Each structure stands twice: as C-alpha cells, then as structure tokens.
Amino acid sequence: MGNSKLSKEEKDEIMKKTKYTSGDIEQLTKDFKVAAASDKKAGFSQEEFIKFFRIRFNEWDEASMVRMFKLFDSDGNGVIDVKEFITALYMMTRAPTTDKLGFLFDLFDSDKSGYLEAGEIEKLVNIVVVCSSAMGYTTSEAIDFVYSITSIKISREEFVKSASQSDKFVRMICFYDNPCKQLLY
C-alpha cells in the first residue's frame, strides 16, 4: 500500500463498505494527496495522521491518537495510504454508531483480550472525562456513565450494546453524527 491511487476494484470495494459515492471518494483522494504531501512521501506518517485527526479529536491524548493510527494502519507499514485514510474518515463520520463504538472498544482493548479491563477502562474514562468536559458535561456524569456499564471488565458486545443506548455517552466521546451530511469530514 502506501500509495495515493485507487484501482477501480478498490474504489468499488470502498463504495460497497461505506456510504461514499464515487464523487466522494474522488474528493477524499484529492484531499488526501494535499494533506499527506507535507513531507513529500506517499501517505500519512503517524505525525501527519495525528495532526489531521487532531482537528476532530483535539481533546484526545497523544497515546490514544497513536493507538488510533495503528488501528487504521491495517497493513502495519507505518504509513496510512489513501484506502486506509478513507476508511478512517468513514469510521469517524458516517459509520453507524455501533461500528464507531466497536472501534472505540478495539482502541482501548490494548492487550487484545476481547475485554476492557481495569487499566483499559481507566484510559477510556480519562478520554470520556476530557471530551465530556469540553462539551459541558460534568466529570461526575462522565464517570457515572462509564461505571454504570461495567465494573471490572466488559466484552466488546456488552460495551457496544450498553454504550449505543446512551446518546449522551456517544456525544461525550466525540463520536457524534456529522450533522452536515454534505461535508465528508
């Protein structure tokens, strides 16, 4: 990977998996080329990815942003290519809430055990507190909600089910729907 061009098959695959049109994908490809060109290399480095996504996730800490980069770097080569970039944007904007919550779970399940355990839950709570404070929620509202869905550990399925039932939680973690549907991100 690592390139900024999509084959017809890749474009068709992306359109099938996302709600993006052919025109959307063309625009995102152009945006990718501009955003990823700062270091004259193909694709987003970890630093460029974090800088780009920091706009939407400005309250997230550096370690969480690095984990996000690694999740989207699906081939593990240290560079986000155009296909990985478009997938990341879709996940952050137009993906169904349950997909976003599954992604959030994967982001914090650092040991890949299939469960969020005490230390991982603590990291999630820290992000929720920061995001919720920025949105005007009290710290206690954020912590109360997180601890209402789990005590010691929770599976991915339980997390997605519980969290998706709370609009407040979805807003607190900054995975809100894009209210302006004509914008791609």
Swiss-Prot record:
Boundaries of every EF-hand domain copy: 60-95, 96-131
GTP-binding found in the keyword field: no
Parts forming coiled coils: none
GO biological process per UniProt: regulation of signal transduction
Highest taxon of source: Eukaryota
Residue sites binding Ca(2+) 2 per the record: D109, D111, S113, Y115, E120
This protein's UniProt keywords: Calcium, Metal-binding, Repeat
Pfam families: EF-hand_1, EF-hand_5
SUPFAM superfamilies: EF-hand
Binding positions (Ca(2+) 1): D73, D75, N77, E84
Molecular-function annotations in GO: calcium ion binding
Keyword check for Zinc: no
Matching Gene3D superfamilies: EF-hand (1.10.238.10)
Family of the protein in this entry: Belongs to the recoverin family.
The protein's name in its UniProt record: Calcium-binding protein K-like
Species: Dictyostelium discoideum
